[in-house]
From Swiss-Prot:
Gene: H2-T3
Region (Alpha-2): 117-208
Classification via InterPro entries: Ig-like_dom, Ig-like_dom_sf, Ig-like_fold, Ig/MHC_CS, Ig_C1-set, MHC_class-I_related, MHC_I-like_Ag-recog, MHC_I-like_Ag-recog_sf
Glycosylated sites: N63, N112, N116, N309
Record-given protein name: H-2 class I histocompatibility antigen, TLA(B) alpha chain
Subcellular location: Membrane
């Protein structure tokens, strides 16, 4: 096999950049929704929040507390959907709030709990696409009072139930055909909506992907370690990584590699320094990229006991709820085809609601945001 002439790194960057410009935006992308319903003895009506995220940016939020309800679009590109679209979405998400209230009561019955405590229902669902628009993965998870309740497995055909109460829900969902409805949505309208939202966003703002960053620790002989600061999956390619000690840049002591294409339209880079063992916390890595709202400062963090994946998700969702209650923003799926199929979506929504509401208290346990999605029917029924 003949070896060709090596391609310069700068040329690889130019080729990758030109390829990325033909896409909606380089890298993988996600559309995620979160629902939260909270009941407390001190409030007459449960607090209900629905939030939608495109990648890591919130674009829509619904907040219902008592008799008041607010619906906020928080990204300029969302307005391209038109007033009729969002009026319909407001109606849907308002209806979902009632389903959550009913499910909070149903869960009290399932677990034989009193009305005097505080209880929370959460749902998170969404989908992700890769560089070329193919579905990467989809998911749906439900939780009650913190722990997992039921979660859709990776095959999108079966559920994992956490306890006997969740087993009842799983059985009724399977009998009602709900599993197939969710899989169809996640593989179709969710992905289609994600791609359309990305295209709308591209029309109103320059495409940037902020770097995913972390610091790794590599022991060396004679009491030294190498600290390597990584920046991954960022776009465009221009980025600056520096190491500092006590606020002073270590220009001469930093090993810096050339920015490299990652193969999916994004880029990667790292910078490393050799430091004395035990002095790692004195060194900071600084990352500058136009996709970041402000420069990042990182240190090497000693490893801690890792949590199981779903526990991590629960912790993240819990943190998002607190942020939502305190500052009006919560954290991180769905969307719909281009074209005039709004009526079809509304019909599908009504059909699924009727199909799944087997019990008056049957619909929606969740923190899976549906705000702003005509393609998604009602919130997933937690119990039925």
């Amino acid at each position: 096999m003949r070896m060709g002439t090596p391609v310069p790194g700068t040329l690889l960057i130019l080729l990758a950049a030109s390829q990325g410009q033909t896409q909606t935006c380089p890298g993988s992308h996600s559309l995620r929704y979160f629902y939260t319903a909270l009941s407390r003895p001190a409030i007459s009506e449960p607090w209900y929040i629905a939030v939608g995220y495109l990648d890591d940016t919130q674009f829509v939020r619904f907040n219902s507390s008592g008799e008041t309800a607010t619906y906020k679009l928080s990204a300029p590109w969302v307005e391209q959907e038109g007033p009729e679209y969002w009026a319909r979405e407001t109606e849907i998400v308002t209806s979902n709030a009632q389903f959550f209230r009913e499910n909070l009561q149903t869960m009290l019955d399932y677990y034989n709990l009193s009305q005097n405590g505080s209880h929370t229902i959460q749902v998170m669902y969404g989908c992700e696409v890769e560089f070329f628009g193919s579905l990467f993965r989809a998911y749906e998870q439900h939780g009650y009072d913190g722990p997992d309740y039921i979660a859709l497995n990776e095959d999108l055909k079966t559920w994992t139930a956490a306890d006997t109460a969740a087993e009842i829900t799983r059985s009724k969902w399977e009998q009602a055909g709900y599993t197939e409805l969710r899989r169809t949505y996640l593989e179709g309208p969710c992905k289609d909506s994600l791609l359309r939202y990305l295209e709308n966003r591209k029309k109103t703002q320059e495409c940037t992907d902020p770097p995913k960053t972390h610091v790794t620790h590599h022991p060396r002989p004679e009491g030294y370690v190498t600290l390597r600061c990584w920046a991954l999956r960022f776009y465009p390619a221009d980025i600056t990584l520096t190491w500092q000690l006590n606020g002073e840049e270590l220009i001469q002591d930093t090993e810096l590699v050339e920015t490299r294409p990652a193969g999916d339209g994004t880029f990667q880079k790292w910078a490393a320094v050799v430091v004395p063992l035990g002095k790692e916390q004195k060194y900071t890595c600084h990352v500058y990229h136009e996709g970041l709202p402000e420069p990042l400062t990182l240190r090497w963090e000693p490893p801690q006991t890792s949590m199981p994946n779903r526990t991590t998700v629960r912790a993240l969702l819990g943190a998002m709820i607190i942020l939502g209650f305190m500052s009006g923003s919560v954290m991180m799926w769905m969307r719909k085809n281009n074209g005039g199929n709004g009526d079809d979506n509304t019909a599908a929504y009504q059909n699924e609601r009727e199909h799944l509401s087997l019990d008056p208290r049957a619909e929606s346990e969740a923190l899976g945001v549906e705000a702003g999605m005509k393609d998604l029917p009602s919130a997933p029924p937690l119990v039925s």
